[in-house]
Amino acid sequence: MKDSPDDYGKLLRQLQAWFPGDGELLDWDMVDAFEGLPWYIEREEFVCVHAGIPLDGEGKFLPWDEISIEQLVHDRRFKDPDVLPNERKCVFFGHTPTSGVRNEEKIITYPRVSNPKNISDFYKVHLDLGTMTSEMVGCICMDTGEEFYVQRELR
């Protein structure tokens, strides 16, 4: 790409087009802030990642240094119901709207016990409700596993 202001302006307009209705709010400062975000967040009880985590033959997470950014961001295999990590941490993920898996815009949970009481009782939680088109956001309480939904009123 050329290093001219016109090229940068065109690129910013292309990025803004991903956010119809409020794309003009996206500026270079925000793009720079996004670039500084981590590709995943790992805590004692859970991992948050955009698309999922590649697993080895025993269902264990591959080591982070063996995973490409493309796998974390684009790989859709983790959404499959039969892909269950053999780990103690719950994985929060999205990338593929849940309506493409179960024909409804609801959080999909994969419990490891029959009566889950908190986030440690889940293998994985599929959070992507296709908010761009469904205008619905789903949240899950990490302490209880209770689900909450907010639907934007259609105009």
List the predicted regions and their residue ranges.
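Short, surface-exposed amphipathic charged segments that create phosphate/polyanion-binding patches used
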Residues: 1-6, 141-143
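Acidic, His/Gly-enriched loop-helix segments that form or flank divalent-metal centers
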Residues: 3-126, 130-135, 151
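Short acidic-glycine loop/turn motifs at beta-strand connectors
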Residues: 43-44, 141-146
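Conserved glycine-rich phosphate/nucleotide-binding loop
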Residues: 136, 144, 149-155
